[in-house]
Amino acid sequence: MAVLLHSLDLPAKMFRPWTDSWIAPLDGFQVPAGAQKPAVWKAAFGVMAAPPPKDTAVFLHSDLLPVNMLWSRGRITGLTDWNSIHRGARAIDVGHCRRYLAALYSPEWSEQLRSLYESIAGVTLDPWWDLYALLHYDDSGPKWIRGQVAGRRPVDVPGMASRVEVAIETALRRLG
C-alpha cells in the first residue's frame, strides 16, 4: 500500500521536520524509561542535530500506521486519518509504520517492512528520515498504542521501548 500511495502525484505542502509533526523539538528528546541501551537513543538524537538530507518528495500520508489501515478478510482495503498529508521523504511514512511494528510485534518485522518496501519500490530509504520517524517513540507511546489497539491484540507494554530501540540501532548501522 505504501508504494502505491507514494506513487500518487497529488498536491500537498512540503513536510517541515520539527514543525509539521508532534515529535519532540530537537532539544526535547529524552531516553524512554524502558530503554535498555540509553547510548543508542543518545546517538540517534545526535544524528538529528544534522540538517535533514535532501530526498525525493513524494505524496505522504504522514500517519501511516497499522492502526490506520482498514482490513477485510486478511487484506488491507483502505486507509484512515488523512489530516496530516504532505510531500516529503518516503522514509517518513515507512518509518512511522516501522515504529509501530517494532513496538507491537518485533524489530524483525519492522526491518522486514523496510526491506520489502525498498525491494518493491526499487529505492533505498534514507536512514536519517527513518530515524526521524522512529524517534517519535517516547514515554507516551505505550499509552497511545494500547489505546489505538484497544484490546484487538495483546500488547506487551514493558517490551515496547527495547523493541523500538533495536529498530533505531539497526537504522544507525545503516547510516554508517
Where are these regions (language model features)?
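Protein kinase-like catalytic domain
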Residues: 2, 6-10, 102, 121
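N-proximal accessory regions
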Residues: 59, 132-176
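Active-site activation/catalytic loop segments of kinase-like enzymes and analogous catalytic loops
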Residues: 92-122, 134-152
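Active-site acidic catalytic loop and adjacent metal/ATP-binding pocket
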Residues: 46-92
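Active-site-adjacent helix/loop segment of glycosyltransferases
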Residues: 123, 127-131
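Hydrophobic core positions within the conserved protein kinase catalytic domain
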Residues: 2-5, 48-49, 98
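An alpha-helical support segment within catalytic cores of ATP-dependent transferases
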Residues: 7-62, 160-171, 175
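Signature tryptophan residues that serve as conserved aromatic anchors
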Residues: 41, 71, 82, 128-129
